[in-house]
């Protein structure tokens, strides 16, 4: 069961996030919560870390997320947060 929270008028974005994780999902990673706020935009909480996507979700962000997850999986890295809100790239936080 995935909890979806926030002032969401259109379910297209949360459904795209769920679809992305269903296609990509390695066995040990699963969605727990999807939140939208006007301040931070979309936040995804998994069993391992938090992902901040920003206010808009597009194919470029999802491809960047997939590349980042592939890199982390290949290198056995587990950040506490992946932040894709910056146009210049991805920020990883390894602190708790």
Model regions and ranges:
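Charged, solvent-exposed interaction patches on well-folded alpha/beta domains
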Residues: 1-96
